Amino acid sequence: MENRKGGNFSVPSSEALTTTLRNAIQALGRGFDVTSDVRLLYCKGAPGSRLVRIEEGQNRDLELSHGFLLPNVPADIDCSRGNSGTQRISVCSFHEMAEEFNVRSGVKGNIPLGCFNAMFNYTGSWQVDAASTKSLALVGYFIPLYDVKLAKLTLVLHNEIRRAVPSSWDPASLASFIENYGTHIVTSVTIGGRDVVYIRQHQSSPLPVSEIENYVNDMIKHRFHEAESQSITGPLKYKDKDITVIFRRRGGDDLEQSHARWAETVPAAPDIINMTFTPIVSLLEGVPGLRHLTRAIELYLEYKPPIEDLQYFLDYQIARAWAPEQSNLQRKEPVCSSLQFSLMGPKLFISADQVTVGRKPVTGLRLSLEGSKQNRLSIHLQHLVSLPKILQPHWDSHVPIGAPKWQGPEEQDSRWFEPIKWKNFSHVSTSPIEHTETHIGDLSGVHIVTGAQLGVWDFGSKNVLHLKLLFSKVPGCTIRRSVWDHTPVASSGRLEPGGPSTSSSTEEVSGQSGKLAKIVDSSEMLKGPQDLPGHWLVTGAKLGVEKGKIVLRVKYSLLNY
């Protein structure tokens, strides 16, 4: 980072400055959720309701400048002046820029904070954002009028905060703790103004690093260092080259077009331009349940589900497995129906095994080529290995739910039949399979997928592959929202820790089996923690044909519990 220092601004005693300073001091020691932007309104609790102990009995008046006094400031709080100047972060990667923001905030690692996302207009999961970003840069002028901070080197939490930590993995209590107290504690607040240009290069942009750096240099020269700031035509020029340029100011009078005139208004209208933090968990040594809270906060910061969904998000962070297990796959080649795609081409045998998982929520599906010749098509289900707590009152083993029901397409309904290669050979029934009696808001309960089976209708050379699903009722729940997902994991860049990768399910094969691998899309269709709000269940699926391949598409739903 480059930092060109300027002189101190003359700071008059203004009502706005006094109010902002007082609010900044009251924010020190309060809880904060760092998935939010750095604004005082995101502090937890009422003003002055600190999570850490502050010596309140030895307050004093602070003389800040030219007789400007700030009365009744606790002895454990320091206040200092800052130096104005230009700062830049040269062209770097998504993760490098995220780490720069974290360093400014006193937070370790490179998982993006809320202030980073807010400045660069990121709203999705960081995995998707990082995959879509080629490079980032920023340049700006910072006017830090005052920096207030906790002077104590050793912070101590109030006892009621320590007692509020759940002693076990209880998603509801953990979510409540984070909502009430945040993830970190505010240790310093900087007030003043900043005028920053954020540059975001998308993956599709052909521009070299040198051209973006030249633009940054021009911005420094013309926007920040000339008496009358000149307009920069760069954003218009770069718009067609997949470069997003974002201008943001904080503090001062934003109606002033000129940077120089805007800077003069900052002392009379300062705002919060930076905050630093310390993790709450760093002050909880020896507290029962610390590891559970640490894990909950780490998951929350990494995936950033909406706070109102955090309980359900945490509840679904259970190990996942694929059914059938690899050890249970048949070693002996079974007798199967088959599909033929051309007169002389290889046959694709279809496993008609029913794959069921009982009362374990299904989160994904995939097609797989199996057997010694990789010529037998089967279907696999990804499921949670245990039942989330939120579902236990509705779906535990003692709860009567009735017999699960298989549902599939009509054999004679040829409207859904699509040829895989040629019309005179095998087809696929593309009929959507979903429980038609379940509607959004239905109070009688919902039906979710707990099993799947492939089958073949024998129409001579025009055999038809079809899908059946097993539906089980979940009483007392309703469907909140449903979506059909047509994006396989592999092509969307999503990551699923611990799950088999798409490459492992599409083995390199040769000869006839290699031809079959080109006909079957074995990409994993699933939703995990990176698919916000992170507690999706499978409620339907359908087979399809795309570009000569048999594909699987899945319907996911969120439940109201």
Swiss-Prot record:
Q: Where is the composition biased (Polar residues)?
A: 500-513
As for what it does, the entry says: Negatively controls the salicylic acid (SA)-mediated pathway of programmed cell death in plant immunity.
What ranges does the record give for the region Disordered, renumbered to this chain?
489-514
Highest taxon of the lineage:
Eukaryota
Native organism: Arabidopsis thaliana (Mouse-ear cress)
| Organ and tissue specificity | Mainly expressed in the vascular system.
Cited SMART domains: MACPF
Keywords, ordered alphabetically = Hypersensitive response, Immunity, Innate immunity, Plant defense
Biological process GO terms, please?
A: cell death; immune response; plant-type hypersensitive response; regulation of salicylic acid mediated signaling pathway; regulation of salicylic acid metabolic process
Please give the family membership noted in the entry. Answer: Belongs to the complement C6/C7/C8/C9 (TC 1.C.39) family.
Q: What Pfam families does its record include?
A: MACPF
Boundaries of every MACPF domain copy: 11-314
Membrane-spanning segments: none
Name of the protein in question: MACPF domain-containing protein CAD1
Phenotype upon knockout is: Constitutively activated HR-like cell death phenotype with endogenous accumulation of high levels of salicylic acid (SA) and constitutively activated defense phenotype against challenge with P.syringae. Dwarf plant with normal cotyledons, but dark brown- or black-colored cell death lesions on the true leaves.
